[in-house]
UniProtKB/Swiss-Prot annotation:
Residues 238-423 form the FAD-binding PCMH-type domain. SUPFAM superfamilies: 2Fe-2S ferredoxin-like (SSF54292), CO dehydrogenase flavoprotein C-terminal domain-like (SSF55447), CO dehydrogenase ISP C-domain like (SSF47741), CO dehydrogenase molybdoprotein N-domain-like (SSF54665), FAD-binding/transporter-associated domain-like (SSF56176), Molybdenum cofactor-binding domain (SSF56003). This is Aldehyde oxidase 2. [2Fe-2S] cluster 1 binds at C48, C53, C56, C78. Pfam families: Ald_Xan_dh_C, CO_deh_flav_C, FAD_binding_5, Fer2, Fer2_2, MoCoBD_1, MoCoBD_2. Binds 2 [2Fe-2S] clusters per subunit. Binds 1 FAD per subunit.
């Protein structure tokens, strides 16, 4: 088995109300693949393939014949096996509503609330909210947060998405008029300059939204109701090419099958088995599905406990536990409450809907969130087999996999019995992860204690940890030794010693973070100790001598209030901007919060991305083969076995390239040697994507390792391994200045790298034409001209033969500037060689492995200052990890050095930067282009000075900030007035000084939780440091019906550039937006374009569109003058009759920009964007976790072209920057392999990471004569403002260290992960853990910054 001669059963289910009957279903086909390939429903997106991002969310509806109810639940389509859907109804975003038929309120509101940018995540967001509303038409805010916890967005910062969802919620607290135009903020108020300005907070009009009518939703198909109530077949069997899927209808049938196929796993939600089979190479020829067996979903309540069927989903378990908690006295629900607590943060809602309790228990994953609690809660597993039922305890022996305490191969888990807790028993659960939700825990724990009646003497004690071994670890020996001990400080001391001795982690333990995880072992027990102590005190049964306030001052009553986890709340905020002038014509959209013009298409799934383009005739698929060595010579590439595989057409190597194989140091396909793990060596072309991907695993490459192998900046410096010369700027006499200061401080700063994590991975479709060697290319890129040039060079054909089309890009952030040209060129070689269209779509793991990201940075600084805080001298030396090739590293180094001074005027200043060459994938352009790393170094110097002077950091910032018209270190003049205004308004709007006092008061009263607050200024230079990179062109056609087609050189990445260009055209032509359209960006309509980057896309392309429209309007003047009362269409028809050209090319020559590095001076940037941000956080010193309490941002946008889009850019960049500085951590193996290459392992911010109060204000009454309509580009500047969260965390850590009498000047390391925060908050627990000599073990991961 499987046997092709056998005939599969028919699979019957519904999609969007229509019946689907499939014969010969392959069990390896997922719902996502079927929807996209078979049904052409491409609204459901493929972004990660592992169930970690939510882009593929759909709703599944199933009827339960036992309870006679129909369940609606969201799932990740990328994990759902198609064969599991027999009898189910699937609803995709296309089935919810469409522009062509009827928009659903969810779709309308997310678009009109400005909740879409690139739009790639939007269908998944829509489906999560839609499913929530099908179950709860008026949900609570908590339910909304839970529903979106499994959905990722890289663009918006989540706030507008949550705002759209909030419109369905029960009326929240706060101003009921917010967003309607009647808010008290929607009135005239004085700005900081004293003048009157119209301030508005209305980005959308809630009253215009259509109401939600639950009666209009699709009904569950009656045919499926009948199927569920009266199934025609007991057992369903589906035979695939490699796997057979069997779904029995009765428990007895399942037991017979399990006896026949004892090695066959049971597959329920496929949340563990699916990813394991895909990425870890696990393979099972037979899969047994118990989903159709009602017996395995039964729930039984008895006087002693709760029995839950093994096939109940974790979401159902959550509801069952919540119901029991509401029915039972509190003393009986201790275990249930602990389980419910973890179920709220375990994965996302979609995974909880899919994963089963039985699968979670049986998998015994080391990071299981429930097994530690179930283990200490005396849970019993009810096993079933043909031989009869059997019970075993969910004990440490079971978790360790001991044969005597485990399932037999022919047994299945039928149900789980969880007993009630009892009087004098306390159960708690703890978990610490990189972020609050949808993240695997670093360490979790379940703990239970039972006391002798009327005493604090331990009668029973159970402790189990996850994340500290290959499975859940039970600390049985420690617990046994503590029996009979009293619950006091002496017991605590002994318990910590015993636990560290028994639950040991080797220095090379999988997952790394060894010292952090060791600390958590005792820190979490201490939390449990305090919780229980508090409960005992509340019962007033604790003997007074049980505490020792001298030895453990933290257990005094005033510190117990610090306990408890951070609660997740729906963020709130105010967005303020300046209204347009009252005299501006209503049809003129410039300055108004116009919805993204693709917003509705995003929300309905009708927006077409690169891989949504329908399959082309004779199309083939390409998959890449990458290096597994960091530095090696290629001895041979053996593809002989591959060419015989089914569907494989060809293997593409460097020998097949007719032209140039990339640059000398950056080959498209490796020749002779490889320089990093992930370098592309060759590619396989096959008839399907699955065949191509499988075939790559069969290519055998023989290597000979080379020396040296360099991964870290430290090693690169040691080996003098650099990619380009040092970049240096200097002013004043720095040596002399250091001799004349009161104090000198020196330090280092480490800033980790960052993955772009655009939701749409790199992808390209190449279609060769039949004549003249022409190619049509559809690419997800920020720079189609670069793709065009690279392909031209690779194929040795003229550029004019290649047309690149870009409809829209699912996020870029700099990652689609250079790399798409490489993938486009490789695909083009395949297309020319085979003569077939080639589609190349990287999966998430390959994308993250190959493409590189933000440059990690290491910096050394020396700062001289007076006791007043005035900085007299500053010397900063920066090194960035460029990876194995130059790419954009020299430019990043230049921008890094140019922008290092940030907002500060320091008379004696030396700034240096170098790009290191290492054996890692080449790092590349990323939003901010070096500024987010460099400015963090400068602000760290400020923090160090503040600590030495005993002054608040904000005072040091104010004292050293630019105050008057001045010149930068590179001699460019500028006026800092907007900078000062932003700073002062941010101080005012955030009530900074009042809150600073409150933070200090909180910290005096709280020992284990600390708050921090920080405000940072920003001077961000916009644009490229070269005039030629600021040029732009546009083409505008007016058709005889009056409609207008606009083409320009910018690319729509989600930043709303197309929307802004049409706003410009509308103003210039004086016509409504409804007349205007942009089809795509194409190298045919606008040639020689510049990359859409550096925040100038809308600015320079807008000037080109403006120019084209002005030319056309000038031509139309005689016609208009002749018929002033005519309509636009009248004028166009008349112009056509008079043979007036209705097409015009617009052009903008660009801003002058230059930099002379020899002299160290120039005018490299057209203008600056100024801003300031204030953030307040609270940290848990015992775990390193933090929550964002509030953020206030003030940004100088001058006259915003579109306040809704610009505020969205600011918020999105801020959250992305916050991720850089707090949760996004790239981990590499000692062999140079990137571990963190999926959303499970690399944590970008989620909805739970948004500050509870998130306010953004565009600085009113600001002007700049240089730019288009006095607007500014805001795409990148908000990134660095995310550092306000970082420095607030640093402030909180400093408060903790201050209270413990530990030095406040500590090494600054970004990201400020829970690991860094916890270990920086040094205390007796960090002191007691064992530390290994680094020379005695090989670490699991290495730092590369």
């Amino acid at each position: 088995m499987p046997c092709p001669a056998q005939i599969s059963d028919d699979l019957e289910f519904f999609v969007n109300g229509r019946k689907v009957t499939e014969k010969n279903v392959d069990p390896e086909v997922t719902l996502l693949a079927f929807l996209r390939k078979n049904l052409c429903l491409t609204g459901t997106k493929d972004a990660c393939g592992t169930g970690g991002c939510g882009a593929c969310t759909v709703m599944v509806s199933q009827h339960d014949p036992v309870c006679k109810k129909t369940r609606h639940f969201s799932v990740m389509a990328c994990l759902v096996p198609l064969c599991s859907l027999h009898g189910a109804a699937v609803t995709t975003v296309e089935g919810v509503g469409s522009i062509k038929t009827r928009l659903h309120p969810v779709q309308e509101r997310i678009a009109k609330s400005h909740g879409t940018q690139c739009g790639f995540c939007t269908p998944g967001m829509v489906m999560s909210i839609y499913t929530l509303l099908r179950n709860h038409p008026q949900p609570s805010e908590e339910q909304l947060m839970e529903a979106l916890g499994g959905n990722l967005c890289r663009c918006t910062g989540y706030r507008p998405i949550l705002e759209s969802g909030r419109t369905f919620c029960m009326e929240p607290d706060g101003c009921p008029q917010k967003g309607t135009g009647q808010c008290c903020l929607d009135q005239k108020e004085s700005d900081s300059s004293g003048s009157k300005s119209d301030i508005c907070t209305k980005l959308f009009v809630k009253d215009e939204f259509q109401p939600l009518d639950p009666t209009q939703e699709l009904i569950f198909p009656p045919e499926l109701l009948r199927m569920a109530e009266n199934p025609e077949k007991q057992t369903l069997t589906f035979y695939g090419e490699r796997i057979t899927w069997i779904a029995p209808g009765t428990l007895q049938e399942l037991l017979v099958l399990k006896a026949k196929y004892p090695e066959a796993p049971l597959i329920s939600g496929n949340t563990a088995l699916g990813p394991a089979m895909k990425s870890q190479g696990h393979f099972y020829p037979v899969l047994l599905s118990p989903a159709r067996i009602p017996d395995l979903r039964m729930v039984t309540k008895t006087s002693g406990g709760l029995t839950i069927g093994a096939c109940c989903s974790l979401a159902q378990v959550k509801d069952i536990l919540a119901e029991s908690i509401s029915e039972l006295p509190q003393e009986k629900t201790q275990t249930y409450r602990a389980l419910l607590k973890h179920l709220r943060s375990l994965a996302g809602q979609q995974i909880r809907n899919m994963a089963s309790l039985g699968g979670h228990v049986i998998s015994r994953h080391c990071y299981s969130d429930l097994n530690p609690i179930l283990s200490v809660g005396n849970t019993t597993l009810n096993l079933l087999s043909e031989e009869g039922p059997r019970q075993i305890p969910l004990s440490g022996h079971f978790l360790a996999g001991l044969a005597s305490a485990d399932l037999k191969p022919e047994e299945i888990l039928g149900s789980v019995y969880i007993p009630h807790s009892q009087k004098r028993e306390f159960v708690s659960a703890f978990r610490q992860a990189q972020c609050h939700q949808n993240a695997l825990p670093d360490v979790n724990a379940g703990m239970r204690v039972l006391f002798r009646e009327g005493t604090d003497v331990i009668e029973e004690l159970s402790i189990a940890y996850g994340g500290v071994g290959p499975t859940t670890v039970s600390a049985q020996r420690s617990c046994q030794q503590l029996l009979g001990r009293r619950w006091n400080a002496l017991m605590l001391d002994e318990a910590c010693r015993l636990l560290l001795d028994e639950v040991s982690l080797p220095g090379s333990a999988l997952g790394g973070k060894v010292e952090f995880r060791r600390t958590l072992i005792v820190s979490l027990f201490f939390k449990f100790y305090l919780e229980v102590l508090q409960e005992l005190k509340a019962d007033q049964k604790l003997p007074p001598e049980s505490t020792d306030s001298q030895r453990y001052p933290e257990i005094a009553d005033r510190f117990l209030s610090s306990l408890g986890d951070f609660q997740v709340t729906l963020p709130r905020g105010v967005q303020t901007y300046q209204r347009v002038d009252s005299h501006q014509p209503l049809q003129d959209p410039v300055g108004r919060p116009i919805m993204h013009l693709s917003g509705l298409k995003h929300a309905t799934g009708e927006a077409v991305f690169c891989d949504d383009i329908p399959r082309v005739d004779k199309e083939l698929f390409m998959a890449l083969v990458t290096s597994t060595r960091a530095h090696a010579r290629i001895i041979s590439i053996d593809s002989s076995e591959v060419l015989d595989l089914p569907g494989v057409v060809d293997v593409i190597t460097a020998e097949d390239i007719p032209g140039n194989n990339g640059e000398e140091d950056d080959k498209l396909l490796a020749v002779d040697k490889v320089l990093c793990v992930g370098q592309v060596i060759c590619a396989v072309v096959a008839e399907t994507d699955v065949q191509a991907k499988r075939a790559t695993e069969k290519i055998k490459i023989t290597y000979e390792d080379l020396k040296p192998v360099i991964f870290t900046i430290e090693d690169a410096i040691k080996h003098n391994s650099f990619l380009c010369p040092e970049k240096k700027l200097e002013q004043g006499n720095i040596e002399e200045a250091f001799e004349n200061v009161d104090q000198v401080a020196e330090g280092t700063v480490h800033v980790g790298g960052q993955e772009h994590f655009y939701m749409e991975t790199q992808r390209v479709l190449v279609i060769p034409k039949t004549e003249d060697k022409e190619l049509d290319m559809y690419v997800s890129t920020q720079d189609p001209a670069h793709v065009q040039k690279t392909v031209s060079s690779t194929l040795n054909i003229p550029i004019s033969r290649i047309t690149c089309h870009v409809k829209r890009v699912g996020g870029g952030f700099g990652g689609k500037v250079g790399r798409p040209a490489v993938f486009g060129a490789i695909a083009a070689v395949g297309a020319v060689k085979t003569g077939h269209p080639i589609r190349l779509v990287l999966d998430r793991e390959d994308d993250m492995l190959i493409t590189g990201g933000r440059h990690p940075l290491f910096a050394k600084y020396k700062v001289g200052f007076m006791n007043s805080g005035r900085i007299k001298a500053l010397d900063i030396e920066c090194y960035i990890n460029g990876g194995c090739t130059l790419d954009d590293s020299e430019l990043v180094t230049e921008f890094l050095v140019l922008k290092l001074e940030n907002a500060y005027k320091i008379r004696n200043l030396r700034l240096r930067g170098r790009a290191c060459m290492t054996n890692l994938p080449s790092n590349t352009a990323f939003r901010g282009f070096g500024f987010p790393q460099g400015a963090l170094v400068t602000e760290s110097c400020i923090t160090a000075v503040a600590a030495k002077c005993g002054l608040p950091p904000e005072k040091i910032r104010e004292k050293n900030m630019y105050k008057t018209v001045d010149k930068t270190i590179y001699k460019q003049a500028f006026n800092p007035d907007p900078l000062i205004r932003c700073w002062n308004e941010c101080l005012d709007k955030s009530s900074f000084h009042i809150r600073r006092t409150r933070v200090d008061e909180f910290n005096k009263k709280s020992y284990w939780k600390k708050r921090g607050i920080a405000i940072v200024p920003m001077k961000f230079s916009v644009g490229f440091a070269a005039t030629s990179y600021h040029q732009a062109a546009a083409l505008v056609h007016i058709y005889t019906d009056g409609s207008v087609l606009v083409a320009h050189g910018g690319n729509e990445l989600g930043q709303g550039i197309h929307t802004k260009m049409l706003q410009v055209a509308s103003r210039e032509l004086k016509i409504p937006l409804s007349y205007l359209h942009i089809c795509e960006t194409s190298t045919t309509t606008v040639p020689n374009t510049i990359a859409t980057a550096a925040s100038v896309g809308a600015d320079v392309n807008g000037r080109a569109v403006q120019n084209a429209c002005q030319i056309l309007l000038k031509r139309l003047e005689p016609v208009i003058k002749k018929n002033p009362e005519g309509t636009w269409r009248d004028w166009i028809e008349a112009a056509f009759e008079k043979r007036i050209s209705l097409s015009a090319t617009g052009y903008f020559r660009g801003y002058k920009a230059f930099m002379d590095w020899e002299k160290g001076e120039g005018d490299p940037f057209p203008y600056y964007v100024y801003g300031a941000a204030c953030s307040e956080v609270e940290i848990d010193c015992l775990t390193g976790a933090h929550k964002k309490i509030r953020t206030d941002i003030v940004m100088d946008a001058c006259c915003s072209l579109n306040p809704a889009i610009d505020i969205g850019q600011i918020e999105g960049a801020f959250i992305q920057g916050m991720g850089l500085y707090t949760t996004e951590e790239l981990l590499y193996s000692p062999e140079g392999v990137l571990y963190s290459r999926s959303p499970d392992k690399y944590k970008i911010p989620t909805v739970t990471d948004v500050p509870e109060q998130f306010n953004v204000s565009l600085l009113p009454s600001s002007q700049t004569p240089l730019t288009l309509y006095s607007s500014k580009g805001l795409g990148e500047s908000g990134m660095f403002l995310g550092s306000s969260v970082f420095f607030a965390i640093v402030d909180a850590v400093a408060a903790a260290r201050r209270q413990r009498d530990i030095a406040e000047d500590f090494t600054v390391k970004s990201p400020a992960t829970p690991e860094w925060v916890r270990m920086a908050c040094a205390d007796r627990f960090t002191d007691m853990i064992p530390r290994d000599d680094p020379k005695t073990f090989k670490p699991w991961s290495i730092p590369i910054a």
